[in-house]
Amino acid sequence: MFIKNLPHKTVERLSQYRRALLLILSKEKTHVFSHEIAQMLHITPVQVRRDLMLIGYSGNLRKGYDIKELIDLIGKIIDSERGQRVAVVGLGNLGKAFISYFKGKRSKLSMIAAFDVNPEKINRVFDGVPCYHINQLPEIIKQNNISIGIITVPSEQAPEIAEALVLSGIKGILNYTPKPLNVPAYVYLEEYDMITSLEKVAFFAKKNDERFK
């Protein structure tokens, strides 16, 4: 199921809604109201309702949203029908954390391969994911129809890795280095700069500290 022109931020929140709904479902609830979802995610009920209206879903005034029904609908919208395969480049602590996170998840995303240059990691299996030498990247990406790449290498290596991923047929890249990347328009790029995020948190923590003294 594909909805044209769905805002990027809405897609992000839909993923968050699904995680929240799964948590609520685990508590044996069948229905939930927008204000309950909003409270869990620290957003407004209006935002929740607006996002769900964009995907054509409305709840019952008395009972709220059917949790299982909404989880299924979100899955049809943000997941690929056939599933998508992921590779991580750079098997340091962050790369290993990604592999560990994917282990046992019931997601349509599956971690297929890891790449590194460290001889102690190459040809080993980490939580079910084989690690290959970076020189094997084009071959492994194409062989396994991998469409998403996660970059967790030192920042100076990121542009070269991104280029190799693009040339190998990758359609989406998650960049976890502080180095901004340039990729073709047909490749979706999401960049997460942990230093910037940490400095942002530090700024607002300081602001709140001064405010509530």
Specify the residue positions occupied by each region the protein language model found:
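N-terminal Rossmann-fold NAD(P) dinucleotide-binding loop
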Residues: 95
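Extreme N-terminal segment that seeds HTH/winged-HTH DNA-binding domains in transcriptional regulators
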Residues: 1-30
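Phosphate-bearing ligand-interacting subdomains
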Residues: 17, 22-25, 129-213
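HTH-adjacent hinge/linker in prokaryotic transcriptional regulators
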Residues: 31, 35, 40-85
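Glycine-rich Rossmann-fold phosphate-binding loop(s) that bind the pyrophosphate
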Residues: 91-92
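NAD(P)-binding Rossmann-fold cofactor-contacting core
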Residues: 106-127
